[in-house]
Structures are given as structure tokens and as C-alpha cells.
């Protein structure tokens, strides 16, 4: 992003990219980590989910971000209220099974050809936890993997080298937003008085900033109810 002339005085570069596929799906970067790490963030036995993080110095070899493909209820069968959760768990189970719990890694060029990676290129993964070269594409339904490929290739027009053949894909980041939303009333309470659904897990945010803003609203609602002098 900044070039190579002044590395001593410039911070690690951040980016944000978004594209729309020919089929109408959105593909966009999420939780971009300059000079960051991919971490194994699994929370359920037999399932695997990854996330991204940066230390304060932001000085690892790589930048990383989740590349998100939008989904709709048409992508998962059934009308149960938790059908989206089951779809998420299905992806995480497939990711776990691919490399027996290690983070599956694939070069983007191999992803496009739908073949397992057998060696790395110039880009070396920065991953906390064990990883293994594999075929990340097999985790996803065809519609999602095709959209991801098209979206990443489209981002080349925004950042030169974004879709280079040896760019590293890791999977799967499936916790970007909640697949369910806990209903709350005009006072921000759930059906159970005094219980305030809030933030990403409750379905009211999609990132750190929006979760913080939702938290402020909830704090104000609680103060207004329980501290009469708040107004």
C-alpha cells in the first residue's frame, strides 16, 4: 500500500476491499490485521474456526483478513430458527476433518484449480497453532467457493498482487456475524425482563466498532431504567 521507500517511518499498511460477483453475492475483507497472525479459534470439539489478530507492534511478516462471502437462507436447508447455526457448524466440521484439527492452508492458485497445495511459494503463513497444506475449497459449497474465487480475483483491480497465485488461504472463518438474532423490545430488553441481548453474539453487530456502539446503547438503557436521575 505504501511502497518500500520509507519502511522505518510508516506503519503496517491496512486495507479494506469489497466486490460484488456476477451472481450478486458480496465478497469483502473483514477484521483486517496489519502485520498480523491467523489463530486457531475453535470452540467446539471436532470443529475448527480461525480468526485474525495483531500484536501492538503489528510486525509479523504478513497482513491478513477474513474474506467473507454473503449467504442467505437459500444457502442452508430447513426453516428452523437455528438452521444458520447448523450451516456454520457444518463448515467448521468440514474444516476440522480436512486436516484432523490442524488449520487447513492452500495457495490461491491451487484454490482456483481445485487441487490440494503441496508446497508454499514466497508467502509463508503466520499462524498460531499447527497448519497443514490441503484443499480449502472442498470445505465450501460450490456457490460459495466460486464467489470467493471471483471476488478475490476482482480485488486485484484494487490492490496489485492481491490475487497472486501463492497468496495463502486458511479456513474457515465462520464467526463474522451471528446467524441468529435475539429479539429485543424498544427498551432493548429481551422477553425476559432485565436481560439485554447485545453485540455480535446476539445478532446486533458485525465487528468490534459496531459491537462497542451497541454496548453504549445498552448501557444507556440500563442506566435509564435503574438510575432514575440518569435523565
Identify the meaning behind each predicted range.
Residues 1-231:
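Residues forming the flavin
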Amino acid at each position: 500500500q505504501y511502497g518500500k521507500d520509507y519502511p522505518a517511518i510508516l506503519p503496517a499498511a491496512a486495507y479494506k476491499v469489497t466486490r460484488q460477483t456476477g451472481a450478486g453475492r458480496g465478497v469483502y475483507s473483514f477484521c483486517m490485521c496489519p502485520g498480523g497472525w491467523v489463530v486457531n479459534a475453535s470452540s467446539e470439539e471436532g470443529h475448527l474456526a480461525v480468526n485474525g489478530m495483531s500484536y501492538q507492534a503489528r510486525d509479523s511478516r504478513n497482513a491478513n483478513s477474513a474474506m467473507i462471502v454473503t449467504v442467505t437462507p437459500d444457502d442452508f436447508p430447513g426453516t428452523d430458527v437455528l438452521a444458520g447455526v447448523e450451516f456454520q457448524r457444518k463448515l467448521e466440521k468440514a474444516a476440522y476433518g480436512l486436516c484432523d484439527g490442524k488449520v487447513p492452508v492452500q495457495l490461491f492458485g491451487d484454490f482456483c484449480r481445485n487441487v490440494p497445495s503441496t508446497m508454499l511459494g514466497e508467502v509463508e503463513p503466520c499462524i498460531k497453532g499447527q497448519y497443514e497444506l490441503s484443499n480449502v475449497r472442498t470445505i465450501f459449497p460450490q456457490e460459495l467457493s466460486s464467489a470467493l474465487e471471483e471476488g478475490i480475483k476482482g480485488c486485484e483491480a484494487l490492490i496489485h498482487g492481491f490475487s497472486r497465485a501463492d497468496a495463502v488461504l486458511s479456513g474457515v472463518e465462520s464467526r463474522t456475524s451471528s446467524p441468529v438474532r435475539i429479539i429485543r423490545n424498544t427498551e432493548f430488553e429481551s422477553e425476559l425482563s432485565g436481560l439485554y441481548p447485545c453485540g455480535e453474539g446476539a445478532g446486533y453487530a458485525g465487528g468490534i466498532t459496531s459491537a462497542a456502539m451497541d454496548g453504549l446503547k445498552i448501557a444507556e438503557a440500563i442506566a435509564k431504567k435503574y438510575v432514575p436521575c440518569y435523565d
